[in-house]
Amino acid sequence: MEAVKQNGLALEYAPARFLGDRGIVLEAVQKNGLMLKHAQEPLKRDFAIVLAAVKQDGGALKYAPCSLQCSFKIVFEAAKHDGQALEFASAELRANRSIVLEVAMNLRGLGASCALSYAAAELMDDPEIIMEAIIKHNRSALIYASHRPKSDLNFIIEAIELDLFAFEFASAELRDNSDIPLMA
């Protein structure tokens, strides 16, 4: 237990009997959420343990059972901490506007906008989600937008006002209009 308190990674090397100890596993996932991978199956189904794991590292959702990948609270927390956790959420929750908007609002780091690639296609038609991603991250979020926002003159002008290079992701019809960057 002391080793896990100092470093959650110690769970990876712990004897099997410790991998089923709720207190030890909880301590480990609070330090390193990805240690959920090493927990015994009954503990991987424990809501509190999985919640602690995804709060520490959203990527821990990968090791949660399907029943918890369908939990709004678990997925929302995972998405707050790591938008790419959306990849492991149930299809229903990848189509949940609140969760995808949370992902868009918390994008950070290189390649963060690719988290939107896991969202349901119909949400990539939502201008608020796409604009939030552009504001929080950068123009590359437009890659995942559907054709509708990319073809919306007002939307593209607003995006260009935030990042001039957003114009490169506008629809071909709008890119052919060389006056648009001047309008922004």
Predicted regions located by residue number:
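Non-catalytic tandem-repeat scaffold regions and their flanking low-complexity/translocation tails
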Residues: M1-A184
